[in-house]
Design a protein with these regions (language model features):
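Short, surface-exposed connector motifs at secondary-structure boundaries
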Residues: 18-20, 124-129, 151-154
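Acidic, glycine/GT-rich loop-and beta-edge segments that sit at the periphery of enzyme/chaperone cores
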Residues: 49, 53, 68, 171-184
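Phosphate/ATP-binding catalytic cores across multiple sugar-kinase/actin-like superfamilies
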Residues: 99-127, 172-176
């Protein structure tokens, strides 16, 4: 499981009711938002706030430049950094894929590290069943494809990835007798 939340990305291999291998990194949605703000300052000379950067992330957020269904470009307005005059810029998903590249690569490296340290007996199960993506970051266009291409294991976006962790926690709390390992 790879859960890309706001503050952290959690990568975990779970087997037979237990946590086998895991990693946690502070590269996640909040960093993506900051990446977008920085990119707009550097490439478009425009300053945007966190809320606007979030809107851009949801509207045209992508991690690969070639998508089957391309979103419409996002028009952003803000002050020019030099003159403070209002300016407008059209932002494409290709630009966002470019500006998120380094952060996504950090997550890929963490996934590879977890897989490298996973016992070989479990590795074949992972290859057979794939890896599930959850959290808001899982909604970035092209993420499952990029990870699949990088790791050569199929990645799947969980149903309702924004709430998957909360639903799983609720289920575990309903059936604590089956999930005692979670209560440690």
């Amino acid at each position: 499981v790879v859960d890309i939340g706001g503050g952290t990305t959690e990568i975990a291999v779970i087997s037979l009711g237990g946590l086998v291998q895991q990693d946690s990194i502070r590269t996640a949605g909040d960093v993506f938002t900051s990446d977008i703000q920085y990119y707009l300052r550097q490439q478009h000379n425009i300053r945007v706030g966190e809320i606007t950067a979030e809107k851009i992330k949801w509207a045209v957020g992508a991690v690969i430049p070639d998508l089957d269904e391309e979103p419409e470009p996002f028009i952003v307005r803000g002050p020019n950094l030099m003159t403070a005059h209002p300016v407008e810029a059209t932002i494409t998903h290709q630009e966002i894929a470019h500006c998120l590249d380094k952060s996504i690569a950090k997550i890929e490296n963490s996934i590879l590290h977890v897989l490298e340290t996973t016992p070989p007996e479990l590795y074949s199960d992972i290859v057979e069943n794939g890896i599930y993506l959850s959290g808001g970051g899982a909604l970035l266009r092209g993420l499952a494809k990029r990870f699949t291409d990088k790791v050569n294991i199929q990645f799947h976006v969980a149903d309702d990835p924004l709430h998957a962790v909360a639903r799983g926690t609720c289920e575990a709390l309903k059936h604590t007798d089956h999930y005692q390992f979670l209560m440690r």
